[in-house]
Structure formats: structure tokens, C-alpha cells
Amino acid sequence: MADMKSDDIRAMSEDQMDEAILGLKKERFNLRFQRATGQLENTSRLREARREIARIKTIAAQKRAAKK
């Protein structure tokens, strides 16, 4: 899931985007839990996951708007 490019996301179907978002949300939950317990080493991964979710949601919205 790490470092998804916009072109890679655009090539995904809506179902694949939903699965990617779900996976990233689970990863983000685990990262937050690790941060709270002091086990998180790569703190920047939290920010990356949040931004990847936003990137996928934005492209999904653009695709839906283009269909109309």
C-alpha cells in the first residue's frame, strides 16, 4: 500500500479503491495504537497513510463526477 502514485490509483476500479481505503484505515488504526503505546518507530507513516486515504477519496470523487 505504501507510496501509491496517482496514476496507479486512477487505474483502480471503485471496488479496489474501497478495499485500499479499508486497508489503509486499518493500518492507520494500528499505527495510532502503536504510537499510544510507544512502539511506533516510523511516525511519518501516520501522515503518509492519512494522505493516501485522502488521495484515493479525491480521485474516487473525480471519477464519480466524470460519470455524471
Swiss-Prot record:
Keyword annotations from UniProtKB, A to Z: Ribonucleoprotein, Ribosomal protein
Cellular component terms per the entry's GO annotation: cytosolic large ribosomal subunit
Domain of life: Bacteria
Pfam families cross-referenced by the UniProt entry: Ribosomal_L29
One MF annotation (Gene Ontology) recorded for this entry: structural constituent of ribosome
One GO process term, biological-process aspect: translation
The UniProt record lists the keyword Ribosomal protein: yes
UniProt KW Plastid keyword: no
InterPro entries (UniProt xref): Ribosomal_protein_uL29, Ribosomal_uL29, Ribosomal_uL29_CS, Ribosomal_uL29_sf
Family to which the UniProt record says this protein belongs: Belongs to the universal ribosomal protein uL29 family.
Database matches in HAMAP family: Ribosomal_uL29
Name of the protein in question: Large ribosomal subunit protein uL29
Organism: Rhodopseudomonas palustris (strain BisA53)
